[in-house]
């Protein structure tokens, strides 16, 4: 997360390094995380490749204007799992960010239910072993805050 200014700087820096950039709308101070105008702002002024949000209407708006829309899900119980699988069918996100990312059983269920939608494991992934476990469960990408994992490649994690 960060301020709007920090996010713009981080997106520019990451883009210049050839990285894909996604803005998690709930984590940016200075932007509404509920309005479609925020998605338009991210596309036009921030320059990110996509957004991350738990809000289905914002994912639909992102896709409409050419951004990737990543569905952010907290899967804390069986009901959240069932509802998340229903959302997968109804909004067709470009990816799914599952939290916590160490829930390999949940990652596997989503990976089996969505063979074409990338699964992003996120939250509580702090070691290379946890990162590798998430990938082996079916995650196709990771979103991590641990700096020691930022330079890891898939080859480093899957042997």
Model feature map: region roles:
Residues 34-40, 78-89, 127-131:
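Short, acidic/polar
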């Amino acid at each position: 997360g960060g301020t709007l200014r920090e996010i713009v700087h981080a997106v520019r820096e990451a883009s210049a390094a050839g990285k894909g950039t996604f803005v998690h709308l709930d984590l940016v101070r200075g932007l509404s995380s509920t309005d479609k105008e925020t998605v338009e702002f991210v596309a036009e002024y921030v320059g990110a490749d996509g957004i991350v949000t738990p809000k289905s209407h914002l994912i639909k708006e992102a896709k409409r204007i050419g951004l990737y829309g990543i569905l952010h899900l907290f899967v804390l119980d069986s009901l959240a799992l069932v509802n998340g699988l229903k959302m997968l069918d109804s909004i067709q996100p470009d990816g799914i960010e599952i939290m916590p990312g160490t829930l390999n059983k949940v990652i596997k269920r989503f990976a089996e239910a969505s063979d074409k939608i990338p699964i992003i494991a996120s939250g509580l992934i702090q070691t290379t072993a946890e990162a590798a476990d998430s990938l082996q469960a079916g995650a196709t990408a990771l979103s991590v805050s641990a700096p020691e994992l930022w330079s890891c490649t898939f080859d480093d994690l899957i042997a």
